[in-house]
């Protein structure tokens, strides 16, 4: 679902569709408070996912589990062995909060014992998956370079659009934020995705509740059809979706398997982010160029707010609401806010206290309050500073740092354009419009602009 105040624009397009509230606003660019980065900490934290009814197990119980664990230790690199031990001690390895109730261990074992897609390595997929689970802050959206021996091949695949395959600035911040959240909060499901997407089928199935997309079953089906996600209806309540990366993802994934540099995406990052971009872009994404088409977005990079929340909802099988906080006019000028900062702070804090991460979209403005840039990051925690104000602990997949970063409330709150929140957090504070209504409205607006 979406708030009625949604302004669906792509951050580097900045067209809005909706009335503008005339509210005065101070320039966030004048805020001199700088963000603070936390000290890098590579020790694994205990699993902090949404696990109210999930038993945390830290000991191998059955002969089968012991055998699988031993066989993984026999084949994985030295660093991965240490990380596997950490995953076991923290409860992540035996976590079974996945769509089919398989454990993280089950899926890691399958990565090693069954074939991978052509061009991928069993051990690399295992090592990269374990690393992401051990420290999700290592997940990045940074594209790697194309080695000389692959430049001719990738140029041909690019069908004559010379140079577009040399991606310098990635538009996968939404996808990588969703990937980070999946790894940190749902480790068994993350491993299940990594296993399926790297298999010869290069896909993963997921059963979701239609009620998490719309109150009415037919409206939920409309959304699935609009986003062109392959599905099979089991009944009037549930539907089985098939997620897959685009056809060129395997090229990037193979290159990152054999030529990954520091701070570049792993093969698993490539497959995950391509898949989430495919979901949000109506199956129109091209990993080779990092561009997309699709019916809801006039821009060829990234995902807009509506697409982002649909992707979050189906990946997590949760009713996520996109709440828009900033009011932006047709000239991409920040002219006000849809609510006060106290309400904004309360909603985000309530979500964090529920055990949820909050993916936010923030903007940067110039001296005239015109938006010049936008980005998606994830709020993972909250602390208090000595003066009593809040500090937001965040993850940014585009900052070239494998560690969290901290922002004061005075710095971050004025910059937040929207946030993906659980419906329970928002309650009656925001008047809601169903996903399918917002999608249809967005589609009609774009049709008018292109007519």
Question: Where would I find each of the regions flagged by the language model?
Answer:
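Active-site signature of cysteine proteases
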Residues: 6-31, 39-45, 54, 308-451
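Low-complexity, small/polar and acidic-rich linker and loop segments
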Residues: 34, 43-44, 49, 61
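Active-site nucleophile-adjacent alpha helix/oxyanion-hole segment immediately C-terminal to the catalytic cysteine
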Residues: 55, 59-97, 101-297, 352, ...
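Solvent-exposed helix/loop surface patches that form functional interfaces
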Residues: 301, 306
């Amino acid at each position: 679902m979406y708030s009625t105040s949604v302004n669906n624009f792509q951050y580097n397009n900045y067209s809005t569709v909706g009335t503008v509230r005339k509210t005065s606003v101070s320039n966030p660019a004048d805020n001199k408070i700088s963000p603070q980065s936390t000290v890098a900490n590579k020790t694994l934290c205990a699993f902090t996912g949404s696990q109210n009814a999930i038993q945390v197990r830290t000991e191998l119980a059955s002969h089968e589990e012991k055998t699988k664990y031993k066989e993984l230790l026999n084949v994985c690199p030295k660093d991965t062995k240490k990380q596997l031990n950490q995953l076991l001690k923290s409860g992540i390895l035996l976590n079974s909060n996945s769509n089919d109730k398989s454990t993280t261990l089950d899926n890691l074992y399958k990565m090693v014992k069954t074939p991978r897609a052509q061009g991928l390595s069993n051990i690399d997929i295992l090592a990269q998956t374990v690393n992401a689970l051990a420290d999700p802050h290592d997940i990045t959206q940074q594209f790697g370079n194309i080695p000389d021996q692959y430049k001719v091949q990738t140029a041909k695949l690019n069908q004559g659009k010379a140079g577009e395959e040399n991606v310098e600035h990635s538009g996968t911040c939404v996808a990588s934020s969703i990937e980070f959240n999946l790894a940190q909060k749902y480790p068994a499901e993350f491993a299940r995705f990594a296993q399926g997407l790297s298999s010869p089928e290069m896909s993963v199935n997921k059963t979701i509740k239609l009620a998490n997309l719309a109150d009415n079953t037919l409206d939920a089906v409309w959304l699935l059809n609009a986003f062109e996600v392959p599905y099979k209806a089991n009944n009037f309540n549930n539907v089985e979706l098939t997620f897959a990366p685009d056809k060129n993802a395997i090229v990037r994934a193979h290159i990152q398997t054999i030529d990954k540099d520091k701070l570049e995406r792993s093969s698993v990052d490539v497959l995950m982010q391509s898949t989430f971009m495919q979901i949000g872009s109506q199956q129109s994404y091209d990993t080779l160029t990092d561009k997309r088409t699709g019916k809801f977005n006039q821009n060829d990079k990234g995902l807009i707010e509506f697409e982002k929340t649909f992707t979050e909802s189906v990946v997590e099988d949760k009713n996520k609401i996109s709440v828009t906080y900033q009011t932006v006019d047709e000239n991409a000028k920040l002219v006000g806010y849809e609510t006060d900062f106290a309400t904004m702070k309360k909603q985000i804090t309530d979500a964090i206290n529920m055990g949820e991460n909050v993916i936010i979209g923030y903007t940067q403005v110039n001296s005239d309050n015109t938006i010049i840039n936008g980005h998606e990051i994830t709020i993972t925690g909250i602390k208090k500073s000595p003066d009593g104000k809040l500090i937001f602990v965040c993850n940014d997949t585009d900052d070239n740092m494998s560690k969290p970063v901290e922002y004061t409330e005075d710095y971050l709150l004025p910059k937040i354009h929207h946030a993906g929140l659980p419906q329970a957090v928002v309650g009656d504070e925001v008047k809601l419009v169903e996903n399918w209504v917002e999608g249809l409205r967005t589609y009609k607006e774009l049709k008018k602009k292109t007519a």
